[in-house]
C-alpha cells in the first residue's frame, strides 16, 4: 500500500477538519477547510484511500506546505 501525503496550499488556520482517522475517502472528498484572509479554502483528497494520520489539530495555525494528512491507498 502506498502513502499519499497531503500538504497545505495556504498559510492560515486549520478551521475545520471533516474526516477522522481510519475513515475511507474518495478522490475529491473534502478533508479539511482552512481559513486564510477570511476565505474558506477546502483541502481535498488527491486519491481514494483511508485516512492513516491527521497531522494537524483543528484551530491550529498552518503554513504553506505543512503536512496535514497521510492517506493510505
Region locations from a protein language model:
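Conserved beta-strand segments that form the floor/walls of ligand-binding pockets within enzyme
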Residues: 7, 18, 32, 55, ...
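Short histidine-centered loop motifs in beta-beta connectors
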Residues: 15-20, 24, 53-56
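Short beta-strand-turn/beta-hairpin segments enriched in glycine/proline and small hydrophobics
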Residues: 1-13, 30-48, 73
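A general secondary-structure boundary signal
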Residues: 50-53, 58, 67-72
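A structural signal for short beta-strand/turn segments enriched in small hydrophobics and glycine
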Residues: 22-31, 59-68
